[in-house]
Design a protein with these regions (language model features):
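Mature, function-bearing regions of proteins
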Residues: 2-421
Length: 421
């Protein structure tokens, strides 16, 4: 009897909708189930490949495994969102006057003529030590170059350990925060632990002191505890030191210009309100930015909400063949240089290939009178990691960088950074 009733009900639905409509509904339902199933299947498969099933296992997570997990998250699972999160992490550091003042005094971000290259150089170094194994030459060369660029200011007491620790904290936290707010799922505890473990290893290589953290300097149980500790510390630090300052405002203006470089001039005032809507109240106040009209805050929530819905229900996972790479894996066979694969305000280190020179973005930028990858200026020959930085430092610090890289390469950076905590 029950079977007969079900058959009759199905027939009634089919009759009411019509065969064509019923077929469309059935296909759409299957497609949604397939997309959602494939997304969670890949997440679960990634977890099965790693030996970190419970919290007790996290203390054994190696830096090499942590890097593999974070690379998967950033190149396959949430590439667009993690890039925006890392860009915003940098942006957020400009809300601390001790950081913004130094950057304005060096003129590397405070002046239009230098800001584009400074932004590209920073992206290169981050891409190099996030995109390649902690035991690789590329990762350790990037950290060595970054340490060299910082060292001059550290010796002059212009960069404090707290400045470095706060900057590191944002790279640890912002990806998790943005994914939680705007993506189709949150990061799992294992993934959060991986970000904590990976960045703890980078901080060690930078010589950052963790004494200010609850379990610092070296009593952290695992990457998840490190994540929780640095998040707690950063919140307290922001309350005291993220305060209004004209240097903050100057950098906010210049960075917003870079972020909106590809927007038509007529839309830039609206874009500035969108950027302001992405800030929290404390950051907006510190950067002396006007509060955006409520419409923009609601619009941002709506746009990201629609994106989250579409990603969760209507899009299959990104194929492995389409992993996102921000820099080239292989060097140019003649010059040994690498290239960036995308650009923001200026095409620094972009190889002027046919696809780059004649892309839709290039045509739009050409029509607007903006720079595009035509092989003129902006180092189209590519980059070498030890040359990255201000133009006046090209060719400087090579011996120091090589020595630091070799020391890091010999320090077993692939092991668990909490093994001796």
């Amino acid at each position: 009897m029950a079977s007969t009733n079900s058959t009759n009900s199905l027939a009634s639905i089919t009759g009411a909708l019509g065969l064509r409509a019923t077929t469309v509904v059935a296909v759409l339902t299957c497609y949604i189930a397939l997309c959602r199933g494939l997304r969670y299947l890949r997440r679960d498969q990634q977890h099965l490949q790693m030996p970190y099933k419970i919290r007790e296992d996290f203390r054994k997570m190696t830096a090499e495994d942590a890097w593999k997990i974070t690379k998967y998250v950033q190149s396959l699972e949430f590439p667009w969102m993690t890039k925006k999160a890392l860009s915003f992490a940098l942006f957020k550091t400009y809300g601390i006057p001790s950081i913004s003042k130094l950057l304005c005094e060096t003129q590397q971000l405070g002046k239009v003529e230098y800001a584009g290259r400074r932004f590209a150089d920073t992206n290169i170094l981050i891409s190099e030590f996030l995109g390649y194994s902690p035991t690789s030459q590329r990762c350790n060369s990037a950290i060595a170059r970054m340490n060299y660029l910082h060292s001059r200011y550290q010796k002059a007491n212009k960069i404090s350990n707290d400045d470095m620790l706060y900057t590191l904290s944002l790279f640890v936290m912002e990806v998790e925060r943005w994914v939680k707010l705007y993506e189709w799922r949150v990061l799992t505890p294992m993934e959060i632990c991986a970000f904590g473990t990976h960045w703890k290893g980078i901080g060690d290589a930078m010589g950052i002191d963790y004494s200010s953290l609850r379990h610092g300097p070296e009593s952290f149980t695992d990457g998840l505890e490190f994540f929780e500790d640095i998040k707690e510390w950063a919140e307290t630090y922001e309350k005291e030191y993220m305060v209004p300052d004209r240097y903050n405002h100057q950098l906010a203006e210049e960075t917003t210009r870079i972020l909106l470089a590809n927007a038509p001039d007529a839309l830039k005032p609206y874009g500035q309100n969108v950027v302001a809507a992405l800030m929290d109240d404390r950051l907006r106040k510190a950067m002396m930015c006007d509060n955006p009209p409520p419409f923009y805050i609601n619009m941002v929530k709506t746009v990201f909400g629609v994106r989250k819905f579409v990603s969760r229900w209507l899009l299959p996972p990104r194929p492995y063949a389409f992993q996102v790479r921000h820099v080239t894996d292989d060097p140019d066979p003649k010059s040994g240089r690498y290239f960036m694969t995308e650009y923001d305000s200026e095409p620094w280190y972009i190889k002027p290939t046919f696809s780059m020179r004649y892309s839709l973005l290039a045509w739009l930028r050409w029509a607007a009178g903006k720079p595009y990858p035509n092989g003129v200026g902006y180092s189209p020959q590519g980059y070498k990691v030890f040359e990255v930085g201000p133009k006046k430092l090209e060719g400087h610090g090579l011996d120091e960088c090589e020595a630091t890289r070799d020391r890091l390469m010999g320090s077993d950076r692939g092991r668990c950074p909490f093994a001796f905590s």
